[in-house]
């Protein structure tokens, strides 16, 4: 055990030690150590997770005869239920795509898709700032990969040109809204690049965009009218949609390849039908949350201006607002100060973000008021 203790001590010395907090949730507030704080770190972007009216409407439709609380098996064995197919058909129909496939989480999706769709003769080109789950999926793919500079499409084009004809297929991998900086990929440029090179596919993770952007809440791809041009459009139900699980929209051939070759799908017990039914209930109503999306954008624009005024650094264009302080100690101290003021703010440190860019990742939700955000900004 000595070697493990030394590792933990080293993390502590670098201000990188992590622990799981004891929390009590009360709507948009969190209580920790008897201190009630406004939650400024949630991914519940539309504020649906604590909406009691939604929850009541969902439960009432069953009259006590609820869907099963467990699937007890992989979908490929005995764990498939009609609600799974219903949700996949609804997702595909809303995106106006041929197929959709469900996964247990966004991590499961990103871990398994690339290994299932690549060979040792394939190439993956990923944005430098893609999520850790995508990096893990790339590593498991056992094929060549390069990471292009963040949102640097000239660099990506150079990599594509250098590798023309060398690989059986190429995947360009990006997030649409990046989880730490809150900035947005230029999907139009990525689609144009993809079309210039043979056997090249575009894989976009919309985890932080689904529900929040687009006329119907379908993400940045919908906002930019590019849904049909993206080969794999992945998103999660665990953030703005207040549920659990994830999806990919794609063509039928890719769906069948994933069903046959994606290990996290094949070898995992499927999500409980009860949870999938709740996801269906929320996803069906996604176009109705336009007021929440509009209000969230107003809150976000205000806080982005306030933080930029103080730091002169603001990469974000979304409701993820990074308050970049640089060093670990300063970031930890600021987070503790804001918590004492009644705001649950969390420090983000390396290796989650690059060295020297430690920050407080501020995350706004549509159930906050402008007065609450103004009062918070005054504490910065």
Swiss-Prot record:
N6-(pyridoxal phosphate)lysine modified-residue sites: 239
Keywords in alphabetical order: Biotin biosynthesis, Pyridoxal phosphate, Transferase
GO biological process: biotin biosynthetic process
UniProt xrefs under InterPro entries: Aminotrans_II_pyridoxalP_BS, Aminotransferase_I/II_large, AON_synthase_class-II, AONS_Archaea/Proteobacteria, PyrdxlP-dep_Trfase, PyrdxlP-dep_Trfase_major, PyrdxlP-dep_Trfase_small
GO molecular function: 8-amino-7-oxononanoate synthase activity; pyridoxal phosphate binding
Catalytic activity: 6-carboxyhexanoyl-[ACP] + L-alanine + H(+) = (8S)-8-amino-7-oxononanoate + holo-[ACP] + CO2
Cofactor field: pyridoxal 5'-phosphate
UniProt cross-references to Pfam families, sorted A to Z: Aminotran_1_2
Keyword Transmembrane helix among record annotations: no
CDD domains: KBL_like (cd06454)
Binding-site list for pyridoxal 5'-phosphate: 106-107, 179, 205-208, 236-239
Residues engaged in binding substrate: 18, 131, 352
Record note on quaternary structure: Homodimer.
Family as reported in the entry's similarity comment: Belongs to the class-II pyridoxal-phosphate-dependent aminotransferase family. BioF subfamily.
PANTHER family hit by this protein: 8-AMINO-7-OXONONANOATE SYNTHASE, CLASS II AMINOTRANSFERASE/8-AMINO-7-OXONONANOATE SYNTHASE
Function field: Catalyzes the decarboxylative condensation of pimeloyl-[acyl-carrier protein] and L-alanine to produce 8-amino-7-oxononanoate (AON), [acyl-carrier protein], and carbon dioxide.
Protein's name in the database: Putative 8-amino-7-oxononanoate synthase
Gene behind the chain: bioF
């Amino acid at each position: 055990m000595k070697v493990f203790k030394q590792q933990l001590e080293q993390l502590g010395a670098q201000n990188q030690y992590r622990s799981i907090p004891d929390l009590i949730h009360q709507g948009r507030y969190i209580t920790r150590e008897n201190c009630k704080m406004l939650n400024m770190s949630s991914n519940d972007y539309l504020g649906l997770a604590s909406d009691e009216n939604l929850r009541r409407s969902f439960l009432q439709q069953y009259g006590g005869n609820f869907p099963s609380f467990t699937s007890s098996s992989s979908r490929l064995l005995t764990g498939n239920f009609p609600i799974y197919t219903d949700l996949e058909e609804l997702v595909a129909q809303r995106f106006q795509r041929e197929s959709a496939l469900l996964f247990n989480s966004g991590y499961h999706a990103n871990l398994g898709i690339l290994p299932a769709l690549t060979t040792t003769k394939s190439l993956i080109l990923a944005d430098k700032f893609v999520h850790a789950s995508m990096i893990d999926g790339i590593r498991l793919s056992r094929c060549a990969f390069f990471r292009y500079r963040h949102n640097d499409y000239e660099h990506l084009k150079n990599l594509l040109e250098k590798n023309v004809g060398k690989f059986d297929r190429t995947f360009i991998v990006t997030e649409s809204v990046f989880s730490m900086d809150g900035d947005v990929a230029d999907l139009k440029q990525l689609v144009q690049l993809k079309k210039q090179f043979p056997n090249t596919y575009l894989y976009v993770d919309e985890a932080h965009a689904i529900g929040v952007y687009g006329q119907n809440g379908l993400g940045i791809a919908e906002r930019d009218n590019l849904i049909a041009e993206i080969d794999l459009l992945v998103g999660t139900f665990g953030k703005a949609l207040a549920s659990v699980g994830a999806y990919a929209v794609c063509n039928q051939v890719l769906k069948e390849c994933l069903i046959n070759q994606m290990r996290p799908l094949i070898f995992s017990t499927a999500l409980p039908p009860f949870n999938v039914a709740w996801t269906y209930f929320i996803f069906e109503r996604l176009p109705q949350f336009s007021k929440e999306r509009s209000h969230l954008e107003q809150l976000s624009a205000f806080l982005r201006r306030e933080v930029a005024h103080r730091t002169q650094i603001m990469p974000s264009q979304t409701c993820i607002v990074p308050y970049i302080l640089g060093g670990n100690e300063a970031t930890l101290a600021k987070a503790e100060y804001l918590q004492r003021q009644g705001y649950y703010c969390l420090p983000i440190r390396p290796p989650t973000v690059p060295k020297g860019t430690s920050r407080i990742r501020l995350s706004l939700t549509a159930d906050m008021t402008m007065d609450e955000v103004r009062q918070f900004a005054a504490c910065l």
